[in-house]
């Protein structure tokens, strides 16, 4: 899981390498992230290296290699990993347009919040609509959508935090690698990665402190797939 600044720096380094083949200087990185000192960049670089996203090459100045990037799920969901598209809480508001008309295709969409979902020990999912959140339409794609408030930390390594709003596309099926809302025994709902293991279904956490749950298909009902995260800062 990357912090916002870590992700911004990784993206900046990767874009600069694509453009010129040369990584940015520490001063350029500091300016790009609007930091006051280069010590903050050093800490971010070290964190990215420890997490395996970049590598500093020895005995070479400004030698940084990007090893991998967080995978971002599209509407179909990630197959190998998931780093959610994160919407800040104020992005759902219509920006002032100086009196102009906002195109319908750009208007935020009201998505109903249907209750809580466990990213930890399964809890009962509330099925009553409490309120709505405004989401940019290009986050949603086609189909019916709803949101659930995440409770727990079992998906933190996928970038899904306690208190986040999980944006869900209603779906009764899933492919291996999808992060899904799974209803267990018609009683408990949980947010986990879906995989098939022979004739069974595995619900995998993204936190080594939690165990994988292996269940027969008749005990698991897919209620939707994760397409994004709404997070307030």
Curated annotation (Swiss-Prot):
The active site consists of: 154 (for autocatalytic cleavage activity), 192 (for autocatalytic cleavage activity)
Which Gene3D superfamilies does this UniProt record tie to the protein?
Answer: Umud Fragment, subunit A (2.10.109.10), Winged helix-like DNA-binding domain superfamily/Winged helix DNA-binding domain (1.10.10.10)
Q: What are the EC numbers?
A: 3.4.21.88
What does the record give as the DNA-binding region? 26-46
Q: What's in the keyword line of the UniProt record?
A: Autocatalytic cleavage, DNA damage, DNA repair, DNA replication, DNA-binding, Hydrolase, Repressor, SOS response, Transcription, Transcription regulation
Q: Does the keyword DNA-binding apply?
A: yes
| Catalysed reactions, semicolon-separated | Hydrolysis of Ala-|-Gly bond in repressor LexA
Gene Ontology terms: biological process: DNA repair; DNA replication; negative regulation of DNA-templated transcription; proteolysis; SOS response
EC top class, in one word? hydrolase
In terms of InterPro entries, this protein maps to: LexA (IPR006200), LexA-like (IPR039418), LexA/Signal_pep-like_sf (IPR036286), LexA_DNA-bd_dom (IPR006199), LexA_repressor (IPR050077), Peptidase_S24_LexA (IPR006197), Peptidase_S24_S26A/B/C (IPR015927), WH-like_DNA-bd_sf (IPR036388)
Instruction: List residue numbers at the site (Cleavage).
Output: 119-120
Q: Name one GO molecular function term.
A: DNA binding
Subunit comment? Homodimer.
Q: Which HAMAP family match?
A: LexA
Protein family: Belongs to the peptidase S24 family.
For this entry, the protein name equals LexA repressor
């Amino acid at each position: 899981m990357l912090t916002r600044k870590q992700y911004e720096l990784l993206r900046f380094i990767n874009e600069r390498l694509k453009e010129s083949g040369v990584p940015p200087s520490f001063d350029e990185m500091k300016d790009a992230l609007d930091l006051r000192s280069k010590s903050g960049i050093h800490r971010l670089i070290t964190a990215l290296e420890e997490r395996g996203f970049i590598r500093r090459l020895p005995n070479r100045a400004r030698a940084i290699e990007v090893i991998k990037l967080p995978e971002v799920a599209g509407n179909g969901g990630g197959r190998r990993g998931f780093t959610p598209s994160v919407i800040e809480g104020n992005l759902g508001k219509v920006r002032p347009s100086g009196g102009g008309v906002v195109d319908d295709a750009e208007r935020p969409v009201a998505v109903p919040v249907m209750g809580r979902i466990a990213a930890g020990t399964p809890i009962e999912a509330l099925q009553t609509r409490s309120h709505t959140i405004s989401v940019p339409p290009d986050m949603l794609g086609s189909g019916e959508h709803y949101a659930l408030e995440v409770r727990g930390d079992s998906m933190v390594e996928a970038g899904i935090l306690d208190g986040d709003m999980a944006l869900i596309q209603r779906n009764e099926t899933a492919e291996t690698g999808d992060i899904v809302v799974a209803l267990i025994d018609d009683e408990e709902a949980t947010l986990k990665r879906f995989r098939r293991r022979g004739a069974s279904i595995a619900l995998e956490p993204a936190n080594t402190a939690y165990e994988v749950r292996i269940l027969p298909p008749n005990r698991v009902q897919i209620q939707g797939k994760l397409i994004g995260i709404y997070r307030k800062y």
